[in-house]
Amino acid sequence: MSKISATKGLTAILSIMTLGAALSVGTGAARAGDNNVTEDQIVRALAPAEKKPLTRGLSVGPQTQTDPAVTAAETKFVQTIRGRNTRSLSITEREEIATIVKDKPKIDLEINFDYNSADISAKSLPSVQALGRALTNADLKGSTFVVAGHTDAAGGEAYNQDLSERRADSIKRYLVDKYGINGSDLVTVGYGKSKLKDPSQPMAEVNRRVQVVNMENKATASK
């Protein structure tokens, strides 16, 4: 009788251990993919207001009615920065971009790079690839997008400014080379540590991000 009880006890323990291991693996896999987004999520976030479906769970920029004159001025400004080198943008132009994008469809992507470099890390490639597919989606293709690099507060201002610009350029090169996106449709800008997403935690990973903004719809971009 004691042998049977011991056997049952051992079987129960092994079952619990196996279940625990399975749960551990499952949880780890879910956590590993937390920061990667899908093509569909990006398309929904960047779609113009008239095409944006009513969904929950994804933060997007506010959609407001603007004065036609303001819209025309913004469009004219966007045309002046299309095709420009990232480092050629003045501080005034960078701030003008930051002002305009506040009311545009946008998404923040937590793109990791190799330490102290602009090389996209392997674990973040799925997000960049999803971005490439999204920007060639029929709902978005042909628009002009801002690709803005941001860093955390570690390091000096000049260092972070340069790093954010190089990382934005790295994303642009990947999208142009791998997905055939017109380079003039991607406006790259770096903000260094000047626009932290979470100022209360300046060193937090959430601040190290690439923000993608849809500056104008296809009808406007094609004019």
Where are these regions (language model features)?
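Extracytoplasmic/secreted proteins, especially bacterial periplasmic and envelope-associated proteins
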Residues: 41, 76, 123-130, 158, ...
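N-terminal targeting leaders that direct proteins to extracytoplasmic destinations
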Residues: 2-102
